[in-house]
Amino acid sequence: MRVAFKIAYDGTRFHGFQRQPNLRTVEGEIIKALNNSGIMYSDFKSASRTDRGVSALGNVVAITTEDEKALNPMVLNARLEDVWILSAIEVPQDFHPRFWAKSKVYRYYLPSIGLEVEKVKECSQLFLGVHDFSAFSRVDGRDTVRSIDRIEVFTLGPILIIEIEAKSFLWEMVRRIVKALELCGLGRLSCEEIKEMLEGKFEKSKKVPPAPPEGLLLVDIKYEGIEFPLNDKALKKFKREVEERFRQKIMGAYLLWDMIQLL
């Protein structure tokens, strides 16, 4: 049978998703957990090989196995740290998590201090539709034409969230779009300049750099006719452990925020 897992992970704890010799990676930890649980498997495939520092709430991996234990997320969760299996379902035998994906949804969390939010919202709409994103990606030989289906900008406290949905993305594409929007919000890049870059009018030496990977979250990967019901026990474990990390980090973050406000 073919089993697909919806997984979440804290990307700041890993050297990226893909296995690398002598480095801790998301893929490496999942494979280690499969081996330690005694689950025999083959044809391990993933939907997105996120970069170092990038986190996920809804990445998807799949294996072929005859072991029913694979359908219980807690079997692997008991052997995982910083990675959480939120759902495990049986899928068609030819399922490939990357090629079957209908769309991917990313969110970037950007401090809104000093940003003109309305300008960011205005410029963000320029990216909708089909464009050549060579100015907003790390070119690796692939076709640089992509289509963005949706882009939304909204605030959550002192954070500006930029959510982008598309069928596929180029390397560093989301982070470079975010950086361009940040520069717009700071008044250092205009909407007209972004429009020109999307039309190919730019110097390669002056491409927009990527925003830091730590602010990027792979929220979801959508499939036609395939749903991932969350496992109750897995969800409780995930929320408990992530809430504890949030409590630890929010104290330091708001301490620094208050220092700014007090002066």
From Swiss-Prot:
Signal peptide: none annotated. Disulfide bonds: none annotated. The active site is at 51 (nucleophile). Substrate binds at residue 106. InterPro entries: PsdUridine_synth_cat_dom_sf, PsdUridine_synth_TruA, PsdUridine_synth_TruA_a/b_dom, PsdUridine_synth_TruA_C, TruA/RsuA/RluB/E/F_N. One of its GO terms (biological process) is tRNA pseudouridine synthesis. One of its GO terms (molecular function) is tRNA pseudouridine(38-40) synthase activity. It catalyses: uridine(38/39/40) in tRNA = pseudouridine(38/39/40) in tRNA. It comes from the Archaea. The keyword Isomerase applies. Gene3D superfamilies: Pseudouridine synthase I, catalytic domain, C-terminal subdomain, Pseudouridine synthase I, catalytic domain, N-terminal subdomain. The keyword Isomerase applies. Its EC number is 5.4.99.12. NCBIfam families: hisT_truA. Belongs to the tRNA pseudouridine synthase TruA family. Formation of pseudouridine at positions 38, 39 and 40 in the anticodon stem and loop of transfer RNAs. This is tRNA pseudouridine synthase A. It comes from Pyrococcus abyssi (strain GE5 / Orsay).
